[in-house]
Amino acid sequence: MDRYDFSLKLERAFVEYVDRHADEKGFGKGEFAHLVWPEDSPKAASSRWSAMRSKATNTGKPQGLLISDAHRMAAVLGVNLGYILIVLEDRAEMSK
């Protein structure tokens, strides 16, 4: 697996991790999105989070994840971003 593919795999693993942990903490999809992007309207924040979790109809790919968004998501969950990335990177390495 080349570095680009690995990076995309890590990004997708991060989104899945955050989605799962937000559900486990009892956040609704819209509620979580609004906590991550409080400057956006609730509808815009929900659309943004949905675009990261699912494939777009025009490209067939989910929206990419900015490091700033990843940091915000980790903060809402109360988990250190570096910790999440290390755990997910180790898991991805083992599944190569």
Question: How should each PLM-predicted stretch be described?
Answer:
Residues 1-36:
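A short, Lys/Arg-rich alpha-helix, primarily the initiator
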Residues 38-65:
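Recognition helix of helix-turn-helix/homeodomain-like DNA-binding domains
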Residues 65-83:
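DNA major-groove recognition helix of helix-turn-helix/homeodomain DNA-binding modules
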